[in-house]
Regions:
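Chalcogenol-based redox active-site neighborhoods
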Residues: 1-153
Length: 153
């Protein structure tokens, strides 16, 4: 998967049990971020960063989607505990993470690697972050979208 490639479509349940499809967000920017596990230190830092920058993202017309291999129930607890205003998608079989090259296996244990994909309104991958610092990543992503939107004008 490379910058400029079409982002593979998928449908997954969110923390409310509703089905969420990437194609439903066509026409707007999407931050698709993969993370290893709900309610762990790095994942909480990253999710709370996206929560804190959510209004700035929405003002730019951006939707944020978090994806891990945790269940919708686990996502609901994590989302409720930290007041996360965006969908957390349950990729329990790891197929979507695998599709994006973000699945990590340790024997029988599988996780999503901490990676982020910026998807443009045409459904193409505009930027890929394969190495993510949870503490500074969200601001870096918001700034990148601002620059990409400005360049597209």
């Amino acid at each position: 998967m490379n910058v400029g490639s079409p982002a593979p479509d998928f449908s997954l349940p969110d923390q409310q049990g509703r089905t969420c499809s990437l194609s439903a967000f066509r026409g707007q920017w999407v931050v698709l971020y993969f993370y290893p596990k709900d309610d762990t230190p790095g994942c909480t830092t990253e999710a709370c960063g996206f929560r804190d920058d959510y209004l700035a993202a929405r003002k730019l017309g951006v939707e944020i989607l978090g994806v891990s291999v945790n269940s919708p129930e686990s996502h609901a607890k994590f989302s409720d505990k930290y007041g996360l205003p965006f969908p957390l998608l349950a990729d329990t079989d790891g197929k979507v993470a695998s599709l994006y090259g973000a699945l990590w296996s340790l024997g029988p244990i599988r996780f999503a690697r901490r990676q982020t994909f910026l998807i443009d309104p045409q459904g193409r991958i505009a930027r890929i972050y394969r190495k993510v610092d949870p503490g500074s990543h969200t601001r870096e992503v918001i700034e990148a979208i601002r620059l990409l939107q400005h360049a597209a004008k």
